[in-house]
Amino acid sequence: LADYIILAVPVKTAIHYLNRLEELALKETVLVTDTGSTKQEIMAVAQSLSFDFIGGHPMAGSHKSGITAVNASLFENAFYIFTDDTTQKKASRIHELKQLLQGTRAKFVQLAPQEHDCITGMFSHLPHIIAAGLVNQSQIFDDHFPEASRFAAGGFRDMTRIASSDPSMWTDILLSNQTLLLELIKNWQVQTSQVINWIQQEDFENAKDIRDHLPITDKGTLPAFYDLMVDVPDYPGVIGEVTTILGQEKLSLMKLKILETREDIVGVLQISFKTKS
């Protein structure tokens, strides 16, 4: 029988599996955890379980999915959040779980379920909704201006990249954090309405805050590029190694860009080509 069970599935599926596990003859000391992005709903279900459950959420991921997107250093130096009922028994079990996961080299943090969902709602879930909205709006825009997508600069791509994440996973996230997200979206509507009023009233004093944050570099438009994303560790010369390999294959680059870094451990190198092959 298993000592540990990790439910690395979308939130709603994890809840379903918890109920299924309750029907099975598990080891008395089994420790179950999940990797879902919301915690209040699943922790409420866990209160009635006969086995120990610790909520888990590694704050690392990729817009890519499937076995081909595997990354051995994915969790390294990323926050790994645990949620529990703060009892002494659970404290010892969290320590046990940290020992099990120490090979990930993640940074372990404990939060209350509500605190977790508020933080991730603001800094992860809401940005995803906004990114998805931008993608949808751009697709409608393309219907009127078929050439428009050719001129989408790097900033737009960076903002909307997360919208390509697994839709089934995000459906569960949005539904299980529904109340908070509705409040955040309404607050966002207030902010955008305020911007609309400033522009309509030509309120340049208030609009200055927005104007000051508009990019003043990378002016003009960019042609359509074909992008390759490469995970690179942080050490001197690593980008040179990548470009040397490409040069040996006589591949001409249009642009190099580091998309993300995590405390000097790993970055995503965006390599842009003019042609697809």
Predicted regions and their residues:
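An anion/phosphate-binding loop that grips the pyrophosphate of nucleotide cofactors and donors
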Residues: 2
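N-terminal Rossmann-like NAD(P) cofactor-binding module of classical short-chain dehydrogenase/reductase
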Residues: 5-6, 33
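Glycine-rich, N-terminal phosphate-binding loop of Rossmann-like dinucleotide-binding domains
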Residues: 8-10, 36, 84
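Beta-loop-alpha module in the N-terminal Rossmann-like domain of NAD(P)-dependent dehydrogenases
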Residues: 8-20
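Rossmann-like NAD(P)(H) cofactor-binding subdomain of soluble oxidoreductases
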Residues: 17-68
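Internal alpha-helical scaffold of NAD(P)-dependent oxidoreductase catalytic cores
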Residues: 74-162
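Interdomain hinge/lid region at the active-site interface
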Residues: 144-211
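A conserved regulatory-domain signal marking ACT and ACT-like small-molecule sensing domains
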Residues: 213-277
